[in-house]
């Protein structure tokens, strides 16, 4: 049985004062009056990415404190643990910290992630942050997932109807260009008449992480300002117990198990240290890491900040006590732990049936053989930032664009989601594997750029941040494109000796390059490609990848020597 708080509501600010006034006048029982605090268990998971089945590869395990690895994850086990953890508490609330779908497993993505929304509905999620991946297919598709309705092209592929999410999807810093909120910034739940608020934020640079065209008319504002503003609003209306779902995370200096805290730096940590002291608990996401920390808020009071890996491998749990008089969280009584979603308890049969149904429907397509490999194609990066998988994908896109005059191709590493591993004695790979490696379904475009523009694009692989650090995103080049990179040089002057098919690129020359639509729209900060001169479509990235593998089967992993590192 799914357990929820006595009342769940998602109300805009205009209706909040009346709702709170009603809740405050509710009488307490004698037993409640004797207990000065009410206990509430807050549960959260993050970055599920449509993982209805236990995830493959490195995402299938969790590292324990003793260094051992245990199998973990899978929607049916996640639901079973959530039920177990909720059953241990009189009152509980269940949150997701975003990236519920997008870059999803085949069994979810084949059906436009409708099975994942059904899963979340059945699990009794009370509220979810919006992650950047919820906007992979644009705001219009996000709204369909939120409110329901069949896909405008494919219809309802996982049933006759699609009802959408029955829980609020939140982002306090996503607005329309005119400043109006594009979704709810918060929601309020009630436990024995006491309001518990939850705020959510998404990355301020979301527009660079998704196809810009899909989020046209939206802006993503500063996270800290949005948190503080919304916390003040909730406090004004008498909501004193507040959780934050922050779709931003950190990379711990070391991984010493689910409940370690090797978090020493990073934007998410800085935000957690600076966020309004009115916020009592912070759940984070996006970095797919595990940690359980207590950090001081701006008033010096301890505050939980934690994350639970990804793909349903961990449930983050915080037990809080709320003072009935002040309606605020008693911080010194809070306790937190990350519960690993192991496979040594019975899975939830209802959710297992849902996962099995989706997997069975997708399996016939996913099992089709595409090609064979003589060695694995992985995302492991060399010193130059190249990988064997990235280079093959770039070669595939060059081949797809060659009919439109493409002389080279570049692809972003963020579009490579899984390694392509050979199976069986002949090294076979399936459509399901290629889909997992290239799941976004981006269209390909062939553009005309000048030599100067090409150099600018390559220089944009090194992007300065406001905190003085540099974000490095090395694009995978096709075999026809070579250049030298010097990381010790000044930003903007790190790329030299660019050659196409061995010929030196000249600034005033014109060249045809194949890129996916994400890059053509300026995604990941590659504004240079937005010129779109003489742009033509060249099919879909996944189709190009599977066709290239089939044509060149058996495929041998290429050398990673297209970028020369100097300095």
Model-derived features: positions:
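Acidic, metal/ion-coordinating pockets
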Residues: 34-343, 384, 388-399, 409, ...
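Sec-dependent N-terminal signal peptides
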Residues: 7-21
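Feature captures C-terminal
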Residues: 38-41, 51, 159-173, 177-186, ...
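C-terminal region of N-terminal signal peptides and the immediate post-cleavage residues
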Residues: 21-36
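Hard-cation-handling environments
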Residues: 329-429
